[in-house]
Amino acid sequence: MNAVDELIRLYAKQLKIPSFAEYQEVLRQADPSAGFSDLLLELMKAETASRQENQNRRRLKAAGFPYLKTMEEFDCSQLNDAVSPLFLQELASCQFIQNRQNVIMIGNPGRGKTHLAIALGLKACTQGYNVLFKNAATLSTELCEAKDNYHLGRLERTLAKADLLILDELSYLSFNRHQSELLFKVISDRSEKSSTIVTTNLPFSNWTDLFENTTMVAALIDRLTFRSHVLDMNGDSYRLKATMQNKA
């Protein structure tokens, strides 16, 4: 490495444009007739792509997904006609986030609700949106602990900053009045400001089994379903169907 190369790497590091330090690779791949402006453009493209990749990585890590699932891996053939592949493609465009709409997925266990929620969250991350994935029961515990430890406001601000909040499994545990009030506030604060995805195996008529305050249940459903897409995903179990196919 000559002195010029060393200086280029040094300045690239100081200016935080590491892709420019790899200019020799761009030169090797470039058209021999390319001019200086063409080479500069290729370097800028490489730097932009690198930054986008790093940002995507950070967003994925911050989202807190328990595992990664994609839209391409989701088998929508077992869903009812109300949830068409075309509609899923529309959701995957993340226009619902741009429109500040919610998505409510209702279906029996094993219907692929969590898979679909994660896949939509992954799409959102790659499109530049900040996403948070939270199990509903875990979040209610975190909210209570945050309040007891006098940093509830900090957690609420973190949740509010998410362009998309995914509340998974809002059905397996019931919530006491204290937990209900904290969850309600989180959802209420997001209404018409940002998007929320909720997965649950209970129809709205059974949500009174989850929360002590029936009046709050009506208000919660009202907040969630306003400007929302409600997906009825009931039918044969997605996991059961996959298991039977593996045995065949």
Q: What do these predicted regions represent?
A:
Residues 122-134, 144:
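Post-Walker A helix-loop "phosphate-sensing" segment adjacent to the P-loop in P-loop NTPases
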Residues 109:
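The conserved Walker
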Residues 71-94:
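N-terminal pre-Walker A segment at the start of P-loop NTPase domains
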